[in-house]
């Protein structure tokens, strides 16, 4: 499960608090901020130290999720086989990078390093209609689209995505050796359609 929650009344420094079930070994006590590149924050209050279910999420005594009298907005996603996948992977620092299996050809992938600081990096199949997928947007920044083609970030395949990056460093990298990354992926087409026919690679 993934949740984006925002206090719409908090003055100054307000942010989107992000829950991702693969963020850490205890994601119910941790959160990331969609609005910046800071590392995971450890706070048992934000989700009341409670893992969400398919029907209920719990907010504790925290200004980012449940301050008394304030209004909040919250968006929630759950995995649907063949259509959405929210998980994690470990980078290997090589141009022959990690392959991430999703079970579908992606239309949209957002990646964030969870083991340290890092940008929320977005790739999709509309701005790059064929491989290599290199036109990146950053959810936490107001900068223009970045073309990362010289570093060949990733390929979209019929059943996931393949990292191709070894040169970028720090917050713009999606494949640092030993670093853990979380991602959200939504499908263009399932690996196998409703008739049992495999979809084509790009």
Predicted regions and their residues:
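Surface-exposed molecular-recognition determinants
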Residues: 1-202
């Amino acid at each position: 499960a993934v949740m984006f929650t925002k206090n719409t009344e908090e003055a100054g420094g307000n942010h989107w608090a992000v829950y991702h079930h693969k963020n850490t070994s205890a994601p119910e006590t941790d959160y990331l901020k969609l609005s910046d590149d800071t590392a995971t924050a450890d706070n048992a209050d934000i989700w009341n130290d409670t893992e969400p279910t398919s029907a209920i999420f719990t907010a504790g005594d925290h200004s980012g999720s449940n301050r008394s009298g304030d209004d909040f907005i919250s968006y929630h996603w759950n995995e649907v086989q063949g259509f959405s996948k929210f998980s994690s992977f470990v980078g290997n620092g090589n141009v022959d990078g990690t392959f991430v299996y999703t079970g579908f050809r992606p239309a949209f992938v957002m990646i964030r390093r969870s083991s340290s600081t890092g940008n929320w990096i977005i790739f999709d199949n509309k701005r790059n209609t064929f491989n290599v997928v290199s036109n990146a947007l950053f959810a936490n920044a107001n900068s223009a689209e970045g073309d990362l083609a010289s570093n060949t970030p990733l390929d979209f395949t019929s059943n996931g995505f393949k990292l191709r990056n070894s040169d970028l460093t720090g917050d713009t990298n999606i494949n640092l050796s030993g670093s853990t990354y979380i991602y959200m992926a939504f499908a263009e087409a399932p690996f196998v359609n409703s008739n049992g026919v495999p979809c084509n690679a790009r």
